[in-house]
Amino acid sequence: MEVPAWRKTIGEMVRDHMRSPEMEHYFSVKMNKPRARLMITQLGLYIRHRRDCWALVSANCPVMAVKQAILQHEYGEVIKDQFSDYGHLHLIIRQAEKLGMTPQEVIDTKPIGTTTATLHAWAWITHAKSWIEGLSALTVTEWTNDDRLLNDVGGGHSTRMGKRWTDDMGIAWRDMPNFVAHSQADEEHSDMFLPFLERYAVGEKEQMALDAVKESLDLFGGEARHRHRQRDALCAAHRRHRRGEIRHELVEGF
């Protein structure tokens, strides 16, 4: 396939994924601080893990032009770009501060079980499979943030989740730097690897690349759903804790 055909094919796969009942439910859940804290800290782990995965794809790939593109991609993610002079993890830290969290809390975050499983799966794809499959699996997750592709269904992941944060917690868009950055930077990232798929994902490798895209979208959706369930569990625990405090105060009052 040529670049336009790759863009159309992957684009439709992403649109189908983002319109799925599971993702619609994910975006419909009311956001609050316990849920938001879990989300932003697990996203921090995801961003850090991406660096390992892109390095694995580069190590598996013999094509210097692909290695150069990955380094260009990673410079903005790790070093600096127009959104941060300190890399994109700094955006997570700044956004978490709006939830009352410290930088150290973000850095010291432990993954929940489903995060661990999902990150291990992406690591396996990028390590054990071909570089074409690894590249396809990684780049498609950035397509889920592409507002150009998803505008008619409410926007990409960052835009839609940012709206939830604003509607449910009153946090302004400008105070969500991670969402702001990835709603824009990932549009560029969606395009940058398509020429390599056109050139190298040919013959049977074409279907291998598309299978990797599908597998990665399934991982992305599954991780989001499980994170949502964990947020619900945390909120339920928080409510039980608050009810216990209130009962204690009532007893003390007597």
Regions found by a protein language model. Give the residues of each.
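Non-heme di-metal
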Residues: M1-F254
